[in-house]
A protein has these predicted regions:
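Conserved cytochrome P450 catalytic core segment spanning the I/J/K helices
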Residues: 139-142, 227-296
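N-terminal membrane-proximal hinge/A-helix region immediately C-terminal to the signal-anchor transmembrane segment
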Residues: 2-116, 125, 129, 144, ...
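Hydrophobic, repeat-rich solenoid/adaptor surfaces of innate immune receptors and signaling proteins
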Residues: 84-87, 157, 185-186, 238-239, ...
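Alpha-helical membrane-targeting segments
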Residues: 42-51, 207-226
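Cytochrome P450 catalytic-core helices
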Residues: 291-310, 314-316
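Helix-loop "lid/cap" segments that line or gate small-molecule binding pockets
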Residues: 114-123, 185-189
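Cytochrome P450
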Residues: 1-18, 75-82, 140-152, 161-184, ...
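Conserved, non-catalytic sequence blocks in retroelement Pol enzymes and Pol-derived host proteins
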Residues: 31-37, 51-53, 120-123, 138-145, ...
Length: 320
């Protein structure tokens, strides 16, 4: 048995080593377009290892210093990318959406987040209706309706998860709160156990989403793939059940984002199917899981480190 395993290992190495050497030594075919300075790293691995080892800040600062403070090229998750830095880069990106640039995600990320039949569909088509919904739910009139819910959930969360303890992990608890709030506002889900059925696999997705895209058992990326399958399975059940509820009782429409997504029609009068709705919901949940949680964590960190700012915020809260 040991001889067989050893022979199998030698066979695999004999096949993989020449392929790796070929990828390492071949001359890439570049087009005539001028590319920014930088390095795309190792074949397949790209610069994922350096990114994971040093963290985002160190990784970006080193390359800004070495190559350019405005833009540099690198390779993440099997994709060659350009990283824009500073105000000029941000202005260019955000003022040229659907003009000079378009929304895009690496294929490895799409594979973890979307249904298989949508992995190769342009992101513009996958989230075609999301922008109109975002504008709708972020309008001042809409935000007024959310504030009582957000306030009540925040108080309940602080009483249960913060008050009983002398020390807490802010980032972890911020993610727990913002994800539960997203489930409440987007899906009208309040049951903690139901939220947990979505949060646990979603955490696996986020933990492996930016890892090296090797889909082998035991890798972080494989965990992201499995977590994504579970999230989509759970969301599909929620969407299907909500559709049945709306058929039986149309008066329940409009109480949350999901209900409006089910009923909205595109320019051709066509409704979104269940998988399209799930894809859009996943995009919103991704934003709620990390981005908002990071903002909350840094706000609390700065208030702790700057007591004079904290005092002004506190006094302002008392006035309100």
């Amino acid at each position: 048995m040991e001889d067989f395993l050893l022979y199998s290992l030698y066979t695999i190495l004999a096949l993989l080593v020449p392929l790796y050497l070929y990828l390492l030594t071949r001359k890439p075919k570049f087009n005539k377009s001028k590319l920014p300075p930088g390095n795309i790293g190792w074949p397949v691995l790209g610069e994922n290892v350096d990114f994971a080892r040093g963290g985002p800040r160190k990784f970006i600062e080193e390359r800004m210093s070495k190559y350019s403070s405005q833009v540099f090229k690198t390779s993440f998750m099997g994709e060659k990318v350009s990283v824009f830095c500073g105000p000029a880069g941000n202005k260019f990106l955000f003022s040229n959406e659907d003009k000079a640039v378009t929304s895009w995600l690496p294929r490895s990320m799409r594979k973890a987040l979307l249904f298989p039949s949508y992995v190769d569909v342009p992101m513009k088509e996958v989230g075609a209706l999301q922008h109109s919904f975002l504008h709708e739910i972020l309008k001042p009139e809409a935000l007024k309706k959310y504030i009582p819910v957000m306030d009540a959930m925040a108080r309940k969360h602080l009483d249960a998860e913060w008050a009983p303890f002398e020390e807490v992990k802010v980032y972890h608890l911020a993610k727990k709160y913002t994800f539960a709030l997203a489930c409440r506002l987007f899906l009208n889900i309040e049951d903690p156990e139901h939220v947990k059925r979505l949060a646990d696999p979603f955490a696996r997705v986020m933990n492996g989403l930016f890892s090296i895209p090797l889909d082998f058992p035991g890798t972080a990326y494989n965990g992201a793939i499995k977590g994504g399958n579970k999230v989509r399975e759970e969301l599909l059940k929620i969407v299907t059940n909500r559709k049945k509820e709306l058929v039986e009782d149309e008066s329940s429409a409009g109480r949350d984002l999901l209900s409006r997504m089910i009923l909205v029609k595109d320019e051709d009068g066509k409704l979104m199917n269940e998988m399209e709705i799930c894809n859009n919901i996943v995009g919103l949940l991704v934003a709620s899981f990390d981005t908002t949680s990071c903002a909350v964590t840094f706000v609390l960190k700065n208030l702790l480190e700057l007591p004079h700012i904290y005092e002004k915020v506190y006094q302002g809260k008392l006035i309100v």
